């Protein structure tokens, strides 16, 4: 579950870029 959250954060960061 921890990885899922981490993945979501990375995706969100990429969208911000």
Swiss-Prot record:
Q: What is this protein's expression induced by?
A: Identified when cells are grown in rich medium (at protein level).
Q: Which protein, by its recorded name, is this?
A: Protein YtjE
Give the originating organism: Escherichia coli (strain K12)
């Amino acid at each position: 579950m921890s990885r899922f959250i981490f993945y979501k954060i990375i995706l969100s960061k990429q969208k911000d870029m």
